[in-house]
Amino acid sequence: MALIRVLANLLILQLSYAQKSSELVVGGDECNINEHRSLVVLFNSSGLICSGTLINQEWVLTAAHCDSKNFQMLFGVHSKKILNEDEQTRDPKEKFICPNKKKDDEKDKDIMLIRLDSPVSNSEHIAPLSLPSSSPTVDSVCRIMGWGTIKPADETYPDVPHCANINILDHTVCRAAYPVLLAGSSTLCAGTQQGGKDTCVGDSGGPLICNGQIQGIVSWGAHPCGQGSKPGVYTKVFDHLDWIKSIIAGNTAVTCPP
C-alpha cells in the first residue's frame, strides 16, 4: 500500500493535463490541512482528472463529466511533496450517472456517484462530508476547494489544495451570463459580484460547501475564471438527494429530477 500511495503522489505531480471543461480555485489561499478531509483526487496515468467528495466510507460524489476509464481515487492528501501516513487509494467498483441525462449535453445533470472497491477508514485527514438538509439561500457564504489552477487565464497548479469563500447568487445572474442555462435547471449560481474568486481548470467535481454540507458540485463556468459577471455553475446536490439516497440503498433504476 505504501508503494501505491507513493505512485499516486507521483501521478498527481503530472498536472500538465487537465480537461478543458474542468474548473479550479483562483483568488483563494492554501486550505487548512484539516478542512478538506472529504476532498478526493481523481487521477489516471496522465495525472489529475477531477476532484470529488467523500459522502460516506464507501461513496464519492463528483461530476458526470469527470467520468473516465482506468482512474483511481486518492484520499487524505494535502501536499504533493509531503506524504500523509493516512493517505488511502481506491478504485471505483461501480459508477452511476443519471439514466435520464442528455447524452449530447455535458452540462445536463452533471453528477456522478462512485462506489469504492472497499471502504476507506476515517482518520486525521479523511472524513465524509454531510449531504444537505435544506437548500442554500441566496447570499449564503460557501467554501470552494480544489487542486485546480490558481491563475484565471493560464494553468498554474499548486502543491496544496486552495480554498476560497464565495456567495450563492440569484439564479438570474447565471441565466443572464449563460443564455443556455434553463430557468428550472437543478444548478446553483455562485461567485462574487466583484470577481476574483472562482473555481477553475482542475477543480471539476469538487464541492461547494455551505454550513458544513455539500450543496454543490463544481460543473462549469467562464474562461478566464473569476469574472464577476460570469459566476460558476454548480450541480445542485439538494435537488438530487432522492437519487443519491436511492442509489446508495440499491435502487439503481431511479431517475434524476428533470
Curated annotation (Swiss-Prot):
Active-site residue list: 65 (charge relay system), 110 (charge relay system), 204 (charge relay system)
Residue span(s) of domain Peptidase S1: 25-249
First-level EC class: hydrolase
Tissue-level expression: Expressed by the venom gland.
Glycosylation sites: 44
Post-translational modification: Glycosylated.
Cysteine pairs bridged by disulfides in the record: 31-163, 50-66, 98-256, 142-210, 174-189, 200-225
CDD domains linked: Tryp_SPc
Main location (coarse class): secreted
GO BP annotations, alphabetical order: proteolysis
Physiological role: Snake venom serine protease that activates plasminogen. Displays indirect fibrino(geno)lytic activity through conversion of plasminogen to plasmin. Shows a preferential cleavage at Arg-|-Xaa instead of Lys-|-Xaa bonds.
Name under which the protein is recorded: Venom plasminogen activator Haly-PA
Organism: Gloydius brevicauda (Korean slamosa snake)
